[in-house]
Amino acid sequence: MSDNVMTRERPDVGSYEDIAAAASRTTGMTDFGDGVHEEGLRVLVEDLASPEAGLTPRGNYFQRSEVKSALVGVLLTQAQFAAHPEHRDVPIERPIFLMGLPRTGTTILHRLLHADRQSQGLEMWLTQYPQPRPPRDTWEADPIFAAMQQAFTAHHIESPEFMGIHYMDATTVEECWRLLRQTGKSNSYESLANLPRYTDWLKNQDWTDAYARHKQNLQLVGMNDVDKRWVLKNPSHMTALDALMTVYPDALIVYTHREPVTCIASSCSLSAETTEGHSDTYVGGVIGHTQLDLWSRGFHAFHDARAKYDQDQFIDIAFGDLVKDQIGVTRRVYDQFGLDWTPEVEAAVTDIDREAKEGKAAPKHSYDLKDYGLTEKQVLDAFDR
């Protein structure tokens, strides 16, 4: 990620071939693996060039960078897979997946669960450049880590409003959708532009191959921490619960709840802040209606699929409960899944709880559903079961 993404311009996004060639030039690599990513990214690039996307010169640069980042991720992981063939033998046992509508508390709960020294998550820089996780005391000397940290510092200065919505830096444990992008399948693209054809394509996909590669990435990143339990989060896991459970049959699912009117308004605000100045069409009501479609679709897909599985592998967390008692809710998760709640775990969780309520990561965010052409009734009807 670069602060230049915020200012540079292009007359167009370019073709898939052009972007793939640019990714190869950046990395010096040409092995894109089995090519499973290609169909989705071709549909995506064509949609980005359409009048419906309505990209501005800034938007062209930003969106091209997003596609290129996915392809760079493919190239880098292919090289790492080849360099470390033993990654395929790394077990992934009872991983915890947090999911739910955006803005339901998954970020803070993710960080609370990750506080346990027996847990591991995907740090931001390793979601973009997967490799066996180096020792923590070596990160600052890594040129990739240093460049990403510098970029986040610049982004924080340029866009403090965004960081108030969702604070990030290179060290924070983050969502794992960047791994899914390596197969061309990600709901994240739908939150960055108006993409009707890509959305229709994605609705009809089997995500099993995406989660198979997701697992392979976790095996790679966790090679040096094989005894640690994975704690992962991504709201859009709701969309593909069957595929996730096929690849991770012993997964432990933490599902977060909040009334959808607030969730959708907040999600729209995040999309609007992220894409400001990038499109003449992805604004206001278009953001509202595409976000409502995306998240109501995921909500219903999750609830339709959930009943097939052992309910002991699931726990429901209400946002209100999390706000009132973050430590107590974290312990409920441990109790539900039979995990050891020790004094050391409680102390670590307490530290994260304190940090979350003060300092640079404190939430500062306001939003209004009406700004996105939606009414409360429309939202409630879309989520009615």
Where are these regions (language model features)?
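PAPS-dependent sulfotransferases, especially Golgi type II membrane carbohydrate sulfotransferases
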Residues: 1-79, 195-211, 218-225, 267-316, ...
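Pre-Walker A (Motif I) flank of P-loop NTPase domains
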Residues: 93-96
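Conserved phosphate-donor/acceptor-positioning beta-strand/loop module used by diverse small-molecule
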Residues: 233, 244-269
